[in-house]
Amino acid sequence: MAAKRGLAKQKSRVTKACDRCHRKKIKCNSKKPCFGCIGSQSKCTYRNQFREPIEAFFNYTGSLSNDLDNAKCSIAKLKAQLPPSAPASLQKGLANICTELEKIQPQLYLNLDSKEISSYGGLKSIETEIIGKQSKSLNRFSNAFESNTAQNVSMYFGVYSPLLYFASTGISWITKKLISCSNDRETRETIYLFLKFLDASSASHAGPKVTSISPLEYYSKLNGLSCGNDVLIQHIMSNISNEIKGNTNINQTIKFNKPTDWFMYGVQLMEQHHKALDRKSSKKLLPLKYFLEQDELIFCLCLEYFERSLFSTMYDLTILKGLVSLMKHRYWIDDPFVLGRIISTMSRRSLDAGLNRWEYYIGQDEDTAEEYRKLWWDCYWWDRWYSLVTGKQPLIPHEMTSCLFPKDVVGLGVDDSMDCFTLINLVELDPSKFDICISFGYILLTKIITAVFSGLLYNRHFTDYRLFATPNAKDLNGTARQLMVEFSKICKIFQCIQDKLIPFLKQYSENSNVFELYTHFGFAKVCCFQGMESLILRIQNLLQERERIELDSCVKDIRLQTFEASVDILTDVLKHEDTFYIFRCSWFIYAILMNITLNFIETPRRNSICYLSLMCRMIASYNDLFVSSGNVNFKGNNAFSKKLENGTAVSFILTRICCQMYTRSQKMAKESLFCELKKYGQACSDAGQAALDIECIWYRNIIGEHKESSFRKEILSILDREMGDLVNNRVIGVQGKNQEGACYEKLSPSSTSVSVGMDFCSLENFVTAESLPDLLNLFWEDTEFGITKENLGE
């Protein structure tokens, strides 16, 4: 009997369980079902699960929760017993006390047990033990507190990263959804392509990276050079176009004897180079390869002298101006880790210079003060932008910031003391003052991102570890209600923007700067709503069933708004019909395409062919960009070209997923789909055909990737350990299906056989394996997060 004290009460048998459950003589947890149960839509539970132990890391000196309940009950009774003659102010005061008591979060007042913490000698981190298994999710996909294999929140995939879909938990979620809808050959081919994409993209980062070595060392390794730094700089300068250097206005006072001089010269070269991508001048064909080669040369020069300037010009604001200019031209090209180094320097230097405080402006002449105000709000914006694209907390503390808006912005009827609602309501947008309105737009966007990140995503009242470590779920009901209040405020802010600011931006979107601001607003909405969804799911997971259901409508609304915002921004980007402008939007397009794909996966019957046409038109545009450059597969080592190539490949895979989900939900043949897509243009139909053809050239590049990668090694290791001789490391070639493959304009599939290396045996073995669901269960945690009681394939 003693052995059974720690066991949970067994639940009744389920009426339907999958073969895998019967074979292994287990029942699967409804929160962690196997693929078979997903496919049969069964809900099973494990038997003999151990109860969670009460946490031993906290000092429970008393039950604050019970004390609060007693106090609220006493006040409620007192209020009910008041005579009719009692003053109204007394009744109101008692009601206010009850309201304030509701806001108190007992968990936040728990203290750690110092003896337990100091004597802890376990293998897992203290944080892991404190949380235990009370909390099951950090976001829509992850199961971080049940994983025994890896750290789910990494330096790259932050807590609120918009690219969480590409983490292993996100891919696991997508894979299970696809398998639950269909386990046919085409679905398995899609899964294989996704796995191979991750493998190939991991392998592409095996070479030298600008994030891990000095700029000149990076340049020398890429070009196979072995010489001193001065010679390398001369080599870079000699390869920069004379046209770019000739168009750069050099201040005659610059003697180029300081690192700052060289850095600012590099910034001016970058400004001239990027003028070639101006929408008005882009009609003149600029070869992609040439642009990227020149861009990397100039940026390498800038980074080298940026590093040399770090300790030689501690209080020189000249470099700060150069860094702001560099961010404006490079934010859509570089890896976030590279940009993070620049932005962290900008943020620290702007604070050290006192640009964030009004006290430092006293005694300055107005022209200098105005220049510094503009500089400050630029630095503030890029700090918030970085938080948006990485999901990480900002560096600049908003509560310690007090700086006036630039004079021209104040002239629009606003000032720095106003909140987001007031700014939107009072601003007087003037089409004759585009530049000023754009400046206001970035300031407003900065304040909105601050409200979301400081007020919600990194607010201790919603994210403190104590909230997720204590088993008393009823104490979280008040937290959940307050979270909904804050969420409603953010929704209203974005609705106000949609009603007033977005129509203005769309009306004048022919102005490239206006449209750039519009895309920032659209992407910010997507990221903010994704982050809020993750936070709500984290809280929702700890509530009782009734309270959980109350949050379902909120989660549904978030996903709908995220999807609609993604469709809007993709539609408007495509309206420009400017290949190079679409090229510049690549920094956020992949996340947008993934959002649309998730909607196709979850609710395929609700999706229109017009959404699918957007996906096809976008991948056709990226394909045209590479074709116009003369080569789909770049042979060089340019970092951005690799990122663009990988992004285009995954865009084709995502479009393939959407096409498959749509044809199945509509019970439509592929030929009928192509006819429907043809209504949106021949290129749209061609792109759809290419996406569904396993021999498409973009898939050939993925399948033909033979480089070793950590991803491949990890998967093979798990398969070898768990599957034995079912899967082995032999190199098996496979013939690509070559049956009268259609030839599309510009998107022709490969007509040659495809050789597949030592990963998952081969494409043919992978798609014909009888145990694919079991195989996939082995190397990813089974996670199923989302709306309560959702219907698969609805």
Swiss-Prot record:
Null allele phenotype: Confers sensitivity to calcofluor white, and prevents growth on non-fermentable carbon sources such as glycerol or lactate. Sensitizes cells to oxidative stress. Leads to a decrease in peroxisome abundance when oleate was used as a sole carbon source.
Binding site for Zn(2+) 1: 18, 21, 28, 34
Name of the gene this protein is made from: TOG1
Binding site for Zn(2+) 2: 18, 34, 37, 44
Keywords on record: DNA-binding, Metal-binding, Nucleus, Transcription, Transcription regulation, Zinc
One Gene Ontology MF term: DNA-binding transcription factor activity, RNA polymerase II-specific
Record's protein name: Transcription factor TOG1
The UniProt record lists the keyword Nucleotide-binding: no
GO biological process assignments: DNA-templated transcription; positive regulation of transcription by RNA polymerase II
Gene3D superfamilies cross-referenced by the UniProt entry: Zn(2)-C6 fungal-type DNA-binding domain
DNA-binding region: 18-44
